[in-house]
């Protein structure tokens, strides 16, 4: 009797609107799955067009080209004798749906629309799609003529149904549906579905993998069954990095784990599992069986096909494994580095240009490029021909093979220390030493002539000469003189990014990298249109605390001792005059708060969704052992005053890798006004009234003691 099934899931590095490339990656994944004996192949959400099409979903071209790719898949001999489950947008009765299209041997078995759409954080699915709200119901979908000619079908089932093969029952849920309070797999499992599939478009956030794995294992622990999860991987066109983690689970255990970060465009997981293990597991869960007797049945699409074969007694089954998680520092070293690689190769540029200041943030960005070079070299050594072809295109040398990460880094990364009269020798030395250790092409230059020319122009026109505060100038003069240095550096960065390879006789341009962290962006502790303005920023969604942990990891993993002195030095912008040759300005003094405090404010503001008064109330409890109510009030007022004053800077912020749940990214993750009443009169008055009450109560208690 046939009872062992081999199933496949995958993680694909799809690219929004790259229909040709997406088709080839889908076909390759199906080919690998068949070669490994799989009879069912699951792919990521919206894999045909790529998940991140955004407003291109409105365009009829996106629907048309998706249908054309589906036709090519139906027609390909690669897709024969295996059930293929692919994702694409489908219009049904003039309504757009996010769908799974499941087919076998040129016949479409079912079009299953997504029932719960992701619409929080970075997700905006309700903007483009409508959820299918008719649970356990199907309609006829009239196929376009291009598909009718191929399938010889006029209509196919469209809606919430399951597949019934000769040997088992298969049900689909799509990404967000796994995260809902009452996921479809619950009732499907009670109705006898044994194999659950989940096609995801789930992006990376630090520390998120645990939640994803826990949801899958818990689903199969409570109800039994096989669970396949597919996901997109890589950068498909914007700030998000989809982090793979395809998996196969059964009865609460993991049987196959895909990589979370990888340069492989196609990764296929297969597992051979025994259906009888599901049936025996479910048999002794009496609560599940009682609930199953009352569940409403799903429409079943009968499939003349089996996932198992008759002679499978000698077929070895897969063994359970322990899921291996990355630490947050490891996630940072891998995720943004893979994102940089995708951005570099797909933008068809020749490398990166990074202003290297000698501080932690720009050092972390340099280390991410170095980590990228490590991953490229490892992929080439493993025989990844796609990565080798891409790196040869980037360096413009068809016979090139990278020898080691340092040698490759010298070809793709140009670093530049832009000194001013306010720069210290220590930061200059630290930047140079790090550049030597990672192998980047390093440039040192002085910006003073340009700064003096600009300030001189202002003085010539106005007759006024601004001075730094230490020389008797006002706060306005002091800030303006700092900002002109920062903005000059941005202009110089773009000039050198465009022409530095030209000056060396090499073709191509460089992508300018920014290095402002998420905490500084939240507070607005950066100059608008300075070195925070770049083409992309790989650390813009990462906290200072996590960045320091990542840099410490690089000291050990990549043997970069220069990072030790960078970690030990106080963070400074070096925009004000030195005191006796030493740094007189530190970031935390300028901000009026520590980076640790900023992370707390950020999480409370975005994740806990607190305004000034609610944040004050929460911090009263959190900081009761270290701060008085008056101190807490002053800190909260300081944060919200500076945050609202600088909120306008977020509207022009460089696109940054999304990694943190409290990111202030203005693109679509954190939508706020950028013109505030920065005095917050009503909110601050509520805080002040509460402080006065608490102080009065404390005085009464002290008087009572006396």
Curated annotation (Swiss-Prot):
GO terms for biological process: NAD biosynthetic process. The active site is at residues 45, 114, 175, 357. Disulfide bonds: none annotated. GO terms for molecular function: ATP binding; glutaminase activity; NAD+ synthase (glutamine-hydrolyzing) activity. InterPro entries: C-N_Hydrolase (IPR003010), C-N_Hydrolase_sf (IPR036526), Gln-dep_NAD_synthase (IPR014445), NAD/GMP_synthase (IPR022310), NAD_synthase (IPR003694), Rossmann-like_a/b/a_fold (IPR014729). It catalyses: deamido-NAD(+) + L-glutamine + ATP + H2O = L-glutamate + AMP + diphosphate + NAD(+) + H(+). It comes from the Eukaryota. ATP binds at residues 355-362. Keywords: ATP-binding, Ligase, NAD, Nucleotide-binding. Pathway: Cofactor biosynthesis; NAD(+) biosynthesis; NAD(+) from deamido-NAD(+) (L-Gln route): step 1/1. Residues 325-706 are annotated as: Ligase. Pfam families: CN_hydrolase, NAD_synthase. Residues 5-275 form the CN hydrolase domain. Gene3D superfamilies: Carbon-nitrogen hydrolase, HUPs. GO terms for cellular component: cytoplasm. Its EC number is 6.3.5.1. Homohexamer. In the C-terminal section; belongs to the NAD synthetase family. Catalyzes the ATP-dependent amidation of deamido-NAD to form NAD. Uses L-glutamine as a nitrogen source. This is Glutamine-dependent NAD(+) synthetase. It comes from Bos taurus (Bovine). The gene is NADSYN1.
